[in-house]
Amino acid sequence: IPQIVSQIATFFNWIGPSAKTSEWATHKFKMKTRFIEKNIAVPRFGLVKSSREISDFRKVWDVDTVIIKPTDRSGSRGVIRIYKNDDLDYAFNYAKKYSLNNEILLEEFISGPQISTETIIYNGVAITPGIADRVYGDTTAFSPIIIENGGWIPSQVSPKLRQDICVLIEEAARALGVENGVVKGDIVICAARGPLVIEMAARLSGGDFSQSLVPLSLGINY
């Protein structure tokens, strides 16, 4: 979507995401590399070319549980959680099966509440009317595939944490070059490190989050 919007905006000389913004927003490794360059807090990550490299990263990070995913897909396609004794060949091949560019990303798994955000940006100023607590209950039947089965809005996070999330979202959007437009944020709250950006898209969410839940909870049809 961002690439299409970028091309249309360029053709008609409209306001829209640049080609570089679209590239960062749709390639998860390039996105996270950009975030590191701009001091945006993210879980540790790296590209893997084999199941052996999954083991190598887990040793370096000193963790048992990690997330593997294609760098170029959305909608949780190819995303799987890897536990300590799981079959690494299966996990790697599962992610690769969904990849269009054959690039596979590994991330440390952060245990903590996850937050979905919807943000409008105008002249570099971000307003985040949508902050929802993600729900993953009753999804063990799908494990190790990660399936979100709902969300609560308004969020139950504290006012201080809400402010921290809003600041993080604005800084992350700025890092991706979004000056005017919208962004969708995936945030995890780490007990030791605070809110971290899992991913950010230069579009709004699919489903009914931005379309229904945010307007209904705020009483504002934005």
Placement of each model-derived feature along the sequence:
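ATP-dependent carboxylate/phosphate-activation module, predominantly the ATP-grasp catalytic core
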Residues: 86, 108-111, 115, 119-178, ...
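A short, GP-enriched loop/loop-strand-helix hinge that lies immediately N-terminal to
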Residues: 1-27, 39-49
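Conserved protein kinase catalytic/activation segment
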Residues: 193-195
